[in-house]
A protein has these predicted regions:
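Active-site/ligand-binding neighborhood in enzyme catalytic cores
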Residues: 17, 135-248, 265
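Short FAD-binding loop at a beta-strand-to-alpha-helix junction that anchors the flavin cofactor
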Residues: 348-349, 414-432, 438, 442
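Internal hydrophobic alpha-helix adjacent to the cofactor/substrate pocket in enzyme cavities
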Residues: 439-458
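Extreme N-terminal leader/targeting segments of oxidoreductases
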Residues: 1-22, 40-41
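Mid-domain catalytic core of redox enzymes
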Residues: 2, 41, 241-348, 353-362, ...
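Dinucleotide-binding Rossmann-like beta1-alpha1 core, especially the glycine-rich loop
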Residues: 64-146, 173
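N-terminal Rossmann-like FAD-binding beta1-loop-alpha1 element of flavoenzymes
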Residues: 20-47
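Glycine-rich FAD pyrophosphate-binding loop
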Residues: 39-63
Length: 458
């Protein structure tokens, strides 16, 4: 029998007096957080990751002579769950905060949009359009009942509040850049989530954009979490892609691996993988559950990392509204990260968000590289290919679930029809867009749901 207690935060905890063995499949930030929280309650946890290293979308790789994040990440002042985790890991003194600038590239020109004065002087919009755009952002940041925004498309909502001209000049190009044609079926809750997070980040001081990072990037955070897990007795299996999770007549789950003949037995399993994987792997799920997971549309990403001899611009993010540009944005990471950590060089990310079935996933690295570099040459007259010290491309087909109309109503329960099998992945992010802070939030909040279900079963 499990004993129930109440943690200081008010969440449910149960002791592991019956010695249940838990498997957490997926070693990204969500899985890492779940494993750490459960292990701290005394549970017997095994963390299983398909890749050779932990971290998922927050993992690191070699870029020339440096080791840095495979995808771009930034911490906002309002990212309370992530900041609490960083503090818990003893890394708070390694946290660096920097004031940043935001740029727009539209009609072949760059504009700064980093403060109120620059916003009011933004040439592509007249005064009325600026007021409507600013009013839309402010109004979105104040909305509390986000569920009502699930009932209207983002296009209809933005046209209503910003007007047709602002939508067509600003919002539509940005939505197409981020979502492709999927923006047409995306709920207004998407823009609310993005706007409210960014607005919170500017609520301190003089409304400045203060973004942060931990020295060493996510390598520092993930290595600290891995050390913490090992000290808590967590078994970590990397390089083990899960091929099947099946419950036997003895009530235990057998977890099979694609690259091993052996299998492991567990009493409980939590899947943190994208829906496409769990549909294939979890054979005991009902047809209705599989259909609900299948109905979730995902965006993927093709993201280039460039190590350059010199920076491209002074903007952390340059939003792109010209439809000829093949990237979603230009991320100048060295506006935040000290160049000393990058060998005195500049780090730039060029992401392109696309549907999982997009043809860009089938292009060769050379084709993607040529497309991106040609765009940079056109956008930045001072840029030359001789500036490129390293160029690497990451491709992930299932990154972010698209919040379609009435999205929260369409998701299946985390506690599935299979007793002891739980689904806790990023498709359950409802009050925000995909980022590390939201992944940690889902992990910590979902744990309460999982443990309450376990208590009810005892």
């Amino acid at each position: 029998m499990n004993a129930q207690t109440l943690s200081q935060s008010g969440s449910t905890t149960i002791s592991n007096s019956d010695n249940k063995k838990w498997a957490i499949v997926g070693g990204g930030m969500l899985g890492l957080t779940l494993a750490m929280r459960m292990a701290k309650q005394g549970h017997d946890v095994t963390l299983i990751e398909a890749a050779p290293v932990l971290g998922g979308l927050a993992s690191v790789w070699n870029l020339g002579d440096i080791v840095w994040d495979r995808h771009y990440h930034v911490t906002l002042l309002s990212d309370s769950r992530l900041r609490n985790l960083i503090s818990e890991l003893g890394l708070e003194d390694k946290m660096k905060w920097v004031e940043t600038k935001t740029g727009f590239y539209t009609d072949g020109k760059f504009y700064s949009m980093s403060d109120t004065k620059e916003f009011l002087s933004f040439p592509p919009l007249n005064l009325i359009e600026k007021l409507r755009l600013g009013g839309t952002i402010f109004y979105a940041s104040k909305i509390k009942n986000w569920k009502r925004l699930e009932k209207i498309t983002v296009e209809k909502w933005l046209r209503r509040w910003s007007g047709n001209s602002v939508f067509e000049k600003i919002w539509e190009p940005l939505l197409k850049c981020k979502l492709g044609e999927a923006y047409r079926k995306t709920a207004a809750s998407f823009i609310w989530a993005h706007t409210s997070r960014m607005y919170k980040a500017r609520r301190t001081g003089l409304k400045k954009e203060m973004f942060g990072y931990v020295e060493g990037g996510y390598r520092t955070i993930i290595e600290s979490m891995e050390q913490e897990l090992k000290s808590l007795g967590v078994t970590i299996k990397t390089g083990c892609p899960t091929s099947k999770v099946e419950k036997g007549s003895d009530g235990q789950f057998t977890v099979e691996y694609a690259n091993e003949e052996s299998a492991d037995k567990f009493d409980r399993v939590i899947m943190t993988t994208p829906n496409a994987i769990l549909e294939r792997v979890c054979t005991d799920l009902s047809a209705q559950e599989k259909q609900k997971f299948s109905n979730v549309n995902y965006l993927g990403i093709v993201c280039a990392s460039l190590l350059l001899k010199k920076p491209l611009s002074v903007y952390y993010v340059t939003n792109l509204t010209d439809d000829w540009v093949p990237m979603t944005a230009v991320i100048e990471m060295t506006t935040i990260v000290d160049p000393k950590e990058l060998g005195g060089n500049s780090l730039v990310y060029l992401p392109k968000y696309i549907p999982a079935e997009h043809e860009m996933f089938d292009k060769t690295d050379d084709e993607v590289k040529e497309s991106f570099l040609a765009a940079l040459e056109r956008m930045y007259p001072d840029f030359t290919r001789d500036d490129v010290l390293a160029f690497e491309i990451s491709r992930v087909r299932n990154v972010m679930a698209i919040p379609t109309l009435r999205y929260s109503e369409s998701l299946p329960e985390m506690n599935t029809s299979v007793d002891g099998l739980y689904i806790v992945n990023s498709s359950y992010i409802l009050k925000g867009n995909l980022n590390v802070n939201e992944s940690i939030t889902i992990a910590e909040d979902a744990l309460d749901t999982v443990l309450k279900t376990e208590l009810q079963a005892t």
